[in-house]
A protein has these predicted regions:
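Short alpha-helical linear motifs
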Residues: 29, 50-53, 68-71
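A short, compositionally biased N-terminal segment around positions ~18-40 that is enriched
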Residues: 18-39
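A short, surface-exposed loop/turn module that caps and links secondary-structure elements
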Residues: 32-58
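Enriched for short, Lys/Arg-rich terminal
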Residues: 2, 11-25, 59-65, 69-90
Length: 90
């Protein structure tokens, strides 16, 4: 799976890289794992429901999530990153 990032996610990742290198390293590892196997158990990949039922989510840490949409069967566009509440907010 190829991971792509929306302008919003790119901006947020830049902030994280500047402020929290440890979290940035975790994100890099989780994205690499996602590209290798999007359904790896440690990612806790799941489809969202309700108004965001076209989106999927992976766990970066216990509190940080990244949400994505599938552009096709091999390309995921990450459109949100943040805490559980930030990502799942309507």
């Amino acid at each position: 799976m190829t991971a792509k990032f929306s302008p919003f996610v790119q901006k947020e990742l830049k902030k994280i890289y500047q402020k929290d290198r440890k979290l940035a390293n975790i994100i890099e590892k989780q994205i690499a794992l996602f590209e290798e196997n999007p359904k790896h158990p440690s990612l806790r990949t799941h489809k969202l429901s309700g108004k965001v039922s076209n989106m999927w989510s992976i766990s970066i840490t216990m509190n940080i999530r990244m949400a994505y949409i599938l552009l096709d069967e091999n390309i995921a566009l990450f459109i949100k990153i943040g805490t559980h509440d930030e990502v799942y907010r309507k």
